[in-house]
């Protein structure tokens, strides 16, 4: 049984409407979409974080487009398609690391605002924490949960109490969809979310003016 058919089989436990809704939630809350939303919301509501449109475009390119390039790249690289979903995840991890590292270097060399640098540090350290947990400690953490929790935590930081309820609702929907589709266990989702929280906390210590 292929990985795709196994995944489909696990979804058959849910009603068709429930599974379809869960797939839609996961599709619209992929990490690149969330960081894109984060950057656009901040650009139009906290304009002082950005020195100009160029800072926004660089942020979108490095935090959104570079990670997204992993998917077409997997189809272009010889033999990579045969590695299945696991190979796609590994390539996505590499592209995330490349994009987030480049964003951090861009921020350090161009002296972006403290708020924008906090975002760059959070994304860079989130990959480092996931690498430590998944590859070194062998404690499986959901990269999807980490990629969702990160921008939601940042939104709560920038908007205070006003951001907590909507962000909590989004994260609850993501958890529900992942559990419904059996993509992750509750423990993997929790560890992934805590990874984002740890990365954000470390970033506060590093990037605070």
What would you call each of these model-derived segments?
Residues 1-22:
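Short, Lys/Arg-rich, polar N-terminal cytosolic tail immediately upstream
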Residues 25-45:
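The first (N-terminal) embedded transmembrane alpha-helix
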Residues 73-77, 102-110, 129-137:
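Membrane-helix exit/interface motif
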